[in-house]
């Protein structure tokens, strides 16, 4: 019983020190989300998006709750919102890449996996081909993004 109390005290101290007593998302999200991707965007089809360190929204009503950023391999894993029109509460892998010479489009994304039952399956099920952004998203182009 004493061990349980000590473990609880250590964990509660860690939680308080990690969040400074504020009700905010994990600092690691903000520290690992690339600033180039954060903000309001339109793709080359005119669809509007908003991306924060913890939420990717395809307006008006499709949301992906980001649970993991992988900057080394340029993707993030997200849980599909329960109110999405399809694939509710499943998991997605969204690959991204930076563009050069395609201004005003600075980056693009590929919804590589959108219907995995777990986050680990979404992460390992498929990978986008960034060598050919015009066909590297399962035979389709990456959606090119520009700031609104």
Regions picked out by a protein language model, each given a short descriptive name:
Residues 38-71:
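Short, solvent-exposed loop/hinge segments that bridge or flank secondary-structure elements
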Residues 2-38, 100-148:
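Amphipathic/hydrophobic helical signal segments and adjacent flexible N-terminal regions
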Residues 59-61, 72-74, 119, 125:
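Extracellular low-complexity Ser/Thr/Asn/Gly-rich intrinsically disordered segments
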Residues 76-84:
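Short beta-strand segments that buttress and anchor functional surface loops
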